[in-house]
Amino acid sequence: NGTVAAVAQASMPSVVAITTVSVQEIPSFFGYSSRQYKSASTGSGIIVGDNDDELLIATNNHVVDGATTLSVCFIGDDVANAETETVNAGDNGDLNVEDAVSAKIKGTDADNDLAVVAVKKSDIPEDTLNQIKIAQIGSSDDLAVGQQVVAIGNALGYGQSVTSGWISALNRTISTDDGTNSTGLIQTDAAINPGNSGGALLNMKGELIG
């Protein structure tokens, strides 16, 4: 098993920041026409595979749900600037962002809060392609309470942040805002902030476990 620093160094090239933009409509009042406005949110993702043309990135469904525009920042990219550029851009077809790459949703599983997004390899600068890598996948079946873990994600939209803690409990069940229950969850005391959604929880071998 490695140190937190070693796990972070090995795993950060597999973690991305995701910016999403959705268009919402404000209803009209007093006879005025309705208005549309853009709202941006940030999350994280993990590079889990590829094919000849694309990188495949796993994230949470709630990170990308309802998004009309998606962009992905890799290690070393300016996440804050990319968010501003993405909001100011048009739809995905018009997206031309210096510090990020356009992405599209490949599939979603709302019940398990999972989604996969894809990025064209041809859109990624060569020096970035040489840095990033596919995450090592571990098994959550082998976890134990008290085991040390590392969390990496786009905390608060500032870019990649690393925190560490311990597995506090396994197989937790929580109720979500829509009244459904999520089961089999890992509880950790590693700091998790808004923007971490979709990011990596790793064991001390650097393997993805959640």
Give a label for each model feature.
Residues 1-210:
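Serine-dependent protease modules
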